[in-house]
Structures are given as C-alpha cells and as structure tokens.
C-alpha cells in the first residue's frame, strides 16, 4: 500500500466538507476501522462513473490518503483517472452528495457521476 503523507499536498484533494461527512458516517456505523474507497468503473452515460464504498481493509496496491483523521483508499486503475481531482461534499435544496471535480474529464453527464476522458 502506498501512503500519502498527511501534511503534504495530495494528488487527489479531499475538502474539509468531504472529510467531515465521512467522519460523521463512520461515527454512525460505530466502526473506526472504516475507510472510504473512491473508485472509477466502466459504465454510466459517458463511459466511466464514480463510486464510493466503505472498506475495512486496504489492498496492498491501494493508495491511502489520510486527511483530518479519515483514510481514503484509491485502487491503481482509479488513481490514474482521479489525479488532480477534488472530492467535496455538498448540501443543497436538491439534496446532499459527494461531488468530484475532475480536470481529467473531457465530458461529464448531467448527473455529475459519469464522465469520459
């Protein structure tokens, strides 16, 4: 597993809002070993889509990024598509969701969860 240093800038930026929401979700589950896995899969209307899931175990080839007491995991295939991205958590009248601003995406779907490169 590759560790990104806590104080150094990360190739993937997790905002304070995203970290706070993940902390809240982990507290609700009552399992401090949970880590948020951020991944990219084929599919969606633009070719790729983002996904989020909790995981207790980091795979050997995962990149682990620690921010504000939260560990985010990214697998090698997803990492290449997420370098330079910012992951935020937004609350609005339309609902609450994690939002990824990805400079590598050439097009995105209206829902914001699908993209192409």
From Swiss-Prot:
PROSITE patterns: HESB. Gene3D superfamilies: HesB-like domain. It holds the Pfam family Fe-S_biosyn. Iron-sulfur cluster binds at residues 45, 109, 111. InterPro entries: FeS_biogenesis (IPR000361), FeS_cluster_insertion (IPR016092), FeS_cluster_insertion_CS (IPR017870), FeS_cluster_insertion_RrpA (IPR023063), HesB-like_dom_sf (IPR035903). One of its GO terms (molecular function) is 2 iron, 2 sulfur cluster binding. Keywords: Iron, Iron-sulfur, Metal-binding. One of its GO terms (biological process) is iron-sulfur cluster assembly. Its cofactor is iron-sulfur cluster. Binds 1 iron-sulfur cluster per subunit. It comes from the Bacteria. Required for insertion of 4Fe-4S clusters. Homodimer. PANTHER family: IRON-SULFUR CLUSTER ASSEMBLY 2 HOMOLOG, MITOCHONDRIAL. Belongs to the HesB/IscA family. This is Putative iron-sulfur cluster insertion protein ErpA. It comes from Chromobacterium violaceum (strain ATCC 12472 / DSM 30191 / JCM 1249 / CCUG 213 / NBRC 12614 / NCIMB 9131 / NCTC 9757 / MK). The lineage of its organism: Bacteria, Pseudomonadati, Pseudomonadota, Betaproteobacteria, Neisseriales. The gene is erpA.
